[in-house]
Amino acid sequence: ILAQAIACQASPHAPELFPRSYTMSSQKPGLEKRLSATGDDSINQLGGSFKGNSMRHGTAPAKTAKANDPGCFSCFASVPVKDVDVVCIGAGIMSATVGLMIKELEPKWKIVMYERLHAPAEESSNGFNNAGTGHSGFMEPNYTKEVKNPDGTLKTVTTEKVEHVCEQFLSSRLFWDYCVKKGHLPDPSTFIHQTNHIALGIGKDQVEFIKKRYEAMKAKDLFKSMEIALPEDKTKQAQWAPLICAGRDPNQPICMTKIVHGTDVDFGALCKAKVNAFMKLGGDLRLFTLVTNIKRDGTAWIVTSKNTSTGRGVAKVRAKFVFVGAGGWALLMLQKAGIPQVKGYMALPVTGDWAVCQNPEVVARHHVKVYAPGAPGAPPMSMPHLDYRTIGGKEVLLFGPFGSMTFKFLRYGSNLDALKAVKCHNLCSTIGALSRNMGLAVMLMKDVFKSGSGKLADIRHYYPEADAEDWTLIPAGVRAQIIKKDPKTGKGMLQFGTEVVTNDDGTICGLLGASPGASTCVTIALDTITKCFKDKPQFKAWAPKIAQMIPGWTAEGPAGDLSGINCDSIYASTGATLKITPK
């Protein structure tokens, strides 16, 4: 059950979007019911229903484990250490994908997945804790780089990064297509929907950027279906995005591009479905289980854990391979493992809030996702966008995020997370990166202290007729951005993106960073498997199986590289299977 915003409103500590003069008491009847998104939660029926807690300063919902619940450690009572093949730390979209893929490749392997909370997908994979976009670069301006003339005018836009991002998401579509056909995933309409992606430019400078971006991207096969609505195309713009155009000053120039192959993804529902498939194939999910230590034991790793429900019951397993998909806590786990490859790494946690609208009359007029350029130097998470979302089967609009700062690496983490991660080897990198990104800190602090009327003005910049009574704030999750040494200068740098870190022999691997995150989960899984198992004897037998899962994949090429395959055929075949063919 996803009840993020209801808990947020009910809490005396919940952030208010608007001043008291904008009363929320006049919200239409049925609002609470519409926001409670009940889904098919077959995974957690053993322990009953669960609720996501949206209070930023709250803790994970408490729940008492029964003796036979997934959090039970009785199976370890007779032996101090149990041998397994693979341990996945965390039950988010990354571990779910890696666990399911390896289980498909090696059905007889013993794979254990540890989750410290009461259910999978309660952190960044939760529908309200991420953008819910199938990031393909169709509309996200941060994936295209501006090239300017000496006088400062815009010359052109580069497309290398946006092509790579698009190919990565196509890999995800191919794997989900495979899983649906194999019966691993349920009806695709429970987790993915076709949604037009629109890039928006408001004002002269942004209009010029969108036009140049269109010219550069339209020439590429991946984006040849892109359409443009110039400032003079008022009728077309109103058809594409009615909320954006209604009530807008006719003298204000706007420009839009649209691609119909865009998607909205409920990564929370998708993650639970993958974990469910993992369990049906024989995978072992352990809820209420906190990993407290990772220690080398010859060619394997001893993973120590405890029951978070009772606070008792220490258990140990010896794993041949460990995947750390613990979100922001992946850094802390890799530090516990003591691998030298993680030295110099630190994380900058960035959080924020969504403004959410559930008024069905408003939602019905905006079945699109709209992104626009953000402030210079802004992190990907803070790029403002107005999105149609389907979360747990419920339709809502989300705007934002409004950025903020935190010391937690996870939404249900600890305020000591950042302090625990500071080590002698990453102190200089941290200081250097922060000193070079003071503008980011200033931008986040401005959002922190922005008034309700200021946030309403931001919404109205996109949706001029926005009514304050239709909107409220909910937390937007936490993104732990990477801090590391710049390989060129040796100074600390802030890196937006994700990075797979492995030790020398490929026996432990962790994922650091954030955006584009969940959209690239399949590419990350492929990268993990290739880096860690390519020199292992079983990889030769795996390669044709992986190529069957993701047509176009080769062991020699980089993970997610689909440059040698016809993208039209991918859009058509996966669109039909996943029920996201453009209407």
Give residue ranges: language-model regions.
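N-terminal Rossmann-like FAD-binding beta1-loop-alpha1 element of flavoenzymes
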Residues: V84-V112
